Amino acid sequence: MKTATPAILLGLMLATPACANPAPPPLEGPRLVLTGVGRFAVLADLSTVSREGDMTRMRSLQVTEEDFTVGGQTYWGGWSWWTFDCRAKTADRLDFASVREGGAEGPATPDAAPPYPAAPGGDAAELLAIACDPTSAGEADADNLADAVRVGRAALRLAD
């Protein structure tokens, strides 16, 4: 037993530097840009844009008007992941995850509908434009969910 203890301690000491590496820096926070206002305010999250060839993936936030309730629960809106074909100008909404008042998310519900042409002036076309050319978005309107909800709701009030 006495010879095993030094061997274990030596093993722990040799392993410690590998385990002691600092954690990787946190991922970039959201950078939300208002893309349109209709029944809902829609914001694109520039921090989620990833492109491979003509295909781009991005997350968006749909913000509801104040006091939007379903089944007695108040909602801020919901998140969706999208893929866009920048050359074909098609959009594919992959899911929807509701956001309850206070910021609790989910669960995500998959959207099995096939990709469709992004009609000019519609939410999908506005998101596609930003996803395919993120530099056209300019500065972010919000860098967190609560601020995005405030921005979206202010835009909804102005649109009325």
Can you describe what each PLM-predicted range is?
Residues 1-4:
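Positively charged n-region of N-terminal signal peptides that target proteins for export
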Residues 7-16:
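Bacterial N-terminal signal peptides
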Residues 19-160:
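N-terminal secretory-pathway/extracellular module detecting exported/lumenal segments
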